[in-house]
Each structure stands twice: as structure tokens, then as C-alpha cells.
Amino acid sequence: MNFQNDFPSLEDINKLDALEAIPLLDNYLIYNPNDDEALTIRGLKHWSLNHRKEAINDYLQALKINPESRAKMALQFANSILDYYNKDLLNP
């Protein structure tokens, strides 16, 4: 199988719902482990399913590859939401 030609583009994968996209991204990342955009998209898909740990791990991995990745903004967003929730738990 010619993986590059038989595989949907990241743009197409990004349009799919999370449950369809994540397995495709998992396979894509086997062949392209340093693709920060794929990691960011997978992180966003995980976030949409409330898989917070997996999302943050993907964002951090993307940032190791490319410190200017859009994962930077996604991670800041995730941290701000988690900080908000933690404050509510401490100060009901």
C-alpha cells in the first residue's frame, strides 16, 4: 500500500468527527511521528471527547517538535479551562 496516496489528508481528517478521526490519526502518526499538526489535530479531537490527558499529551508532544505549533494556543486554552475548574473545586 502506498500510504501517502491512499491516506486522506489532514485537512480531510480534521473535518471528521473525533471517533472517526482519532484512529486515522493514530495510523498516520505511525508513519509521520514528527507531524506536529497531526498531533495537534488529534489533541483537539481528544479534547472534544473529554479525553483531557490524551489531548494535553498530544499538545506537549507537538510543541516539542515545533514550539510555534498551534498546539501552543490549544494548550493555553486547555490550561485556562482546567485552572477555572480547579478554582471552582477549591472555592465552591
Positions of predicted regions on the chain:
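Helix-start (N-cap) detector for alpha-helical repeat units in TPR-like alpha-solenoids
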Residues: N2-F3, D36-E37, S69-R70
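Alpha-helical linker/edge segments of TPR/alpha-solenoid repeat scaffolds
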Residues: N14, N79-P92
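Short coil turns that delineate tetratricopeptide repeat
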Residues: P33, N66-P67
